[in-house]
Swiss-Prot record:
CDD domains: FabZ
PANTHER family on file: 3-HYDROXYACYL-[ACYL-CARRIER-PROTEIN] DEHYDRATASE
Annotated protein name in UniProt: 3-hydroxyacyl-[acyl-carrier-protein] dehydratase FabZ
Keyword Ribonucleoprotein: no
Assigned keywords, A-Z: Cytoplasm, Lipid A biosynthesis, Lipid biosynthesis, Lipid metabolism, Lyase
Protein family membership: Belongs to the thioester dehydratase family. FabZ subfamily.
Superkingdom of source: Bacteria
Gene3D superfamilies: Hotdog Thioesterase
Length: 152
């Protein structure tokens, strides 16, 4: 049985309605689960066609860690904006990265499963615990904080 607070998955078209990011900086392809405004699981399919692989590194392409963290932040941002509803234009500003650890290289062909869980909220400030997994193995983790700004 699905919990009453669980919302349906969000495909790429839905993400483009929620997030202001576009190619080449939209770092998530879909969200497969959102539990209210508390947690989400995002998916990033890593492909060799992404522009950062031209220079990082041409002979041994590895997804830059900062882009993995950005994928975490975008997944968290989708939770925040989705929780406000479509009637309030809003942005989510990325504020801090704490305790970031990169445990396994992420390479073209990998699928990142990004788990984001809200651990603190005070007014419009939020903190999230994040993990990025490849085939069930932790590739990266971080705590991030963000600020929601509504159009009110």
């Amino acid at each position: 049985m699905v919990a009453a607070t669980t919302l349906e998955a969000v495909d790429i078209m839905g993400l483009m309605k929620l997030l202001p990011h576009r190619y080449p900086f939209l770092m998530i392809d879909r969200i497969i689960d959102i539990d209210g405004d508390d947690s989400a699981i995002g998916i990033k399919n890593v492909t060799i066609n992404e522009p950062h692989f031209q220079g990082h590194f041409p002979e041994q392409p590895v997804m830059p860690g900062v882009l993995i963290v950005e994928a975490m932040a975008q997944t968290a941002g989708a939770i925040c904006i989705r929780s406000l509803g479509a009637s309030k234009p809003s942005l989510v500003y990325f504020l801090t990265i704490d305790n970031a650890k990169f445990r396994k290289p992420v390479v073209p062909g990998d699928q990142l499963k990004i788990h984001v869980k809200k651990i603190k909220k005070r007014g419009n400030l939020l903190k999230f615990a994040c993990e990025a997994l490849v085939d069930g193995t932790k590739a990266a983790e971080a705590e991030i904080s963000a600020m929601m700004v509504t159009g009110d």
